[in-house]
C-alpha cells in the first residue's frame, strides 16, 4: 500500500511539473544588430539570458551558421540585408523545437570570432560575432605602414567610442560617438590643407574599435601626434565646458580625473571585447612614460586649452592626468580632449552645430600644426614632403629629445629592429649622444 501511494505521489508531481513554469524556460532573443567596418563586420545577438551556442561553416556559397540552444525569438523569422565587404545577408529563424539558427551569408571566407558577454550596465546578455576579411585587414595594415615611410608629419585623430558603444547621450538624444566622429572628420580636413602634414582617423564610420587597436593604428601610421576626441557627462545638468587629459602612470591628478578615466576605459566592456588574448597595455614601458614625452603631452594639452578658450567654454584651465588606456601605449605626445558636457543643454546644442564643430576643428588644427612644427624645430627635423631616409647599414647620432620612435620612422624601420640591432633595453629609452647602428 505504501509503495502504491509513493508511486501515485510521484506521478502527480510529474504531471504538475508539466504545467508549472520552471527556471529552464528558453532564452528569448530580443534583437539582432550589426555594424560594418572597412575590413570586418560585427553582428550582435541580444537575449534575456546567457547564450549557449555552436558554430560551423559551409561552402558553395560560404556561410557561417550559429545554432543558439534552448532559445526562441520575440520576432518572426527575418532576413537582414547588409551587403558590405564581408556579409551579404543575415537569416535567423527556428531550426527545431529548441534551437534558433542564425545563417550568415558571406562575401568571401572570413576569420570568425564568436563569444558571449554578460549583462553590463544597460547592455543585455549578448552573443558577439566578429567576421574579419583577413585580406582586407592585411591591406589596411600595409596602407598604414606605407604612410609611415613618408616624410610628412602625421597626426592621428581618434574619434572615441563607436558602434555598440555610443558613449555619453545628451538630453536631446545626441550620441557622443556621432558628435566626435563629425568633429574628427572636420579636424582631418583642416590638417590636410597644410602642406607637409597629413591626418588619419582611427575610425571613419559608426563601428567599434577596441582601445588597443586604436593604439596599434597610431603606431602603424607612425604618428607624430595623437588626439583622442570625446564628450563628457555629469549628473548635474549645469556643469559644462571643455577639458584636456594626459596620461599619468603615477595615479590620477584628482578623483574626478580618475573616475573619467575609468569611464572611458570601460569602452571595451560596453563595445564588446573578448580578453582571451594577452593584453600588454599595462606592461608596456616605452618612450611615453619617459619624462620628456609626458611633458610634451602636458605642454600640448595646455596649448589646446588656450586655443579652445577663444571659441568655447573651458572647465579646467590646465590639463589633468589619469590612466587612460587609449593614451597608454603611444610613444608620441598624446592627449584626450573632452570637447564639452553633452549632458548640458548649451554644450549639447553647440556640439551638434556644424558651424561650431568647424570653428572648434580649426582651433584644434592650428594648435596641433604649431605644436608639431615646434617639436620639429626643437629636434632639428624639417617638415616637408618626400620619403624617409634609408639606413643602409649606417650610424645615427642621437640628438637631445630624440626618441627611437622618431628615429625608426626617419629611417623607414621599426623600433623593435633598432632595439635588436643595438642590444637596447625593451623600454626603448635611448640617451642623447649615443651612436645607433642602422639596418
Predicted regions and their residues:
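Extracellular LysM carbohydrate-binding repeats and other cell-envelope/extracellular binding modules
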Residues: 390-397, 414-439
Amino acid at each position: 500500500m505504501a509503495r502504491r501511494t509513493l508511486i501515485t505521489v510521484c506521478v502527480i508531481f510529474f504531471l504538475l511539473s508539466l504545467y508549472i513554469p520552471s527556471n529552464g524556460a528558453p532564452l528569448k532573443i530580443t534583437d539582432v544588430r550589426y555594424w560594418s567596418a572597412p575590413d570586418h563586420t560585427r553582428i550582435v545577438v541580444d537575449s534575456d539570458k546567457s547564450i549557449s551556442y555552436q558554430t560551423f561553416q559551409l561552402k558553395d556559397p560560404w556561410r557561417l551558421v550559429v545554432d543558439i540552444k534552448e532559445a526562441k525569438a520575440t520576432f518572426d523569422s527575418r532576413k537582414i540585408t547588409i551587403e558590405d565587404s564581408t556579409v551579404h545577408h543575415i537569416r535567423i529563424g527556428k531550426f527545431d523545437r529548441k534551437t534558433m539558427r542564425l545563417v550568415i551569408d558571406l562575401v568571401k571566407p572570413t576569420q570568425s570570432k564568436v563569444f558571449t558577454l554578460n549583462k553590463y550596465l544597460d547592455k543585455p546578455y549578448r552573443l558577439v560575432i566578429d567576421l574579419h576579411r583577413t585580406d582586407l585587414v592585411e591591406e589596411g595594415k600595409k596602407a598604414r605602414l606605407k604612410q609611415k615611410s613618408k616624410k610628412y608629419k602625421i597626426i592621428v585623430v581618434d574619434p572615441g567610442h563607436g558602434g555598440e558603444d555610443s558613449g555619453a547621450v545628451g538630453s536631446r538624444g545626441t550620441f557622443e560617438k556621432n558628435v566626435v566622429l563629425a568633429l574628427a572628420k572636420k579636424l582631418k580636413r583642416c590638417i590636410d590643407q597644410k602642406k607637409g602634414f597629413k591626418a588619419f582617423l582611427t575610425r571613419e564610420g559608426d563601428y567599434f574599435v577596441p582601445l588597443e587597436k586604436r593604439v596599434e593604428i597610431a603606431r602603424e601610421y607612425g604618428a607624430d601626434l595623437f588626439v583622442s576626441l570625446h564628450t563628457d557627462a555629469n549628473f548635474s545638468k549645469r556643469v559644462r565646458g571643455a577639458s584636456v587629459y594626459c596620461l599619468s602612470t603615477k595615479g590620477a591628478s584628482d578623483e574626478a580625473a580618475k573616475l573619467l578615466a575609468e569611464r572611458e576605459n570601460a569602452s571595451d566592456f560596453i563595445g564588446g571585447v573578448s580578453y582571451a588574448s594577452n593584453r600588454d597595455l599595462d606592461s608596456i614601458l616605452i618612450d611615453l612614460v619617459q619624462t620628456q614625452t609626458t611633458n610634451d603631452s602636458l605642454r600640448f594639452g595646455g596649448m589646446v586649452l588656450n586655443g579652445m578658450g577663444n571659441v568655447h567654454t573651458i572647465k579646467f584651465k590646465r590639463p589633468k592626468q589619469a590612466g587612460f588606456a587609449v593614451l597608454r601605449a603611444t610613444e608620441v605626445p598624446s592627449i584626450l580632449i573632452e570637447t564639452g558636457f553633452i549632458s548640458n543643454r548649451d554644450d549639447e546644442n553647440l556640439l551638434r552645430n556644424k558651424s561650431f564643430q568647424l570653428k572648434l576643428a580649426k582651433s584644434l588644427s592650428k594648435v596641433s600644426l604649431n605644436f608639431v612644427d615646434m617639436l620639429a624645430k626643437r629636434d632639428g627635423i624639417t617638415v616637408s614632403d618626400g620619403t624617409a631616409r634609408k639606413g643602409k647599414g649606417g650610424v645615427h647620432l642621437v640628438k637631445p629629445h630624440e626618441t627611437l620612435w622618431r628615429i625608426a620612422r626617419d629611417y623607414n624601420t621599426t623600433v623593435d629592429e633598432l632595439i635588436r640591432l643595438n642590444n637596447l633595453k625593451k623600454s626603448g629609452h635611448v640617451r642623447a649622444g649615443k651612436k645607433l647602428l642602422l639596418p
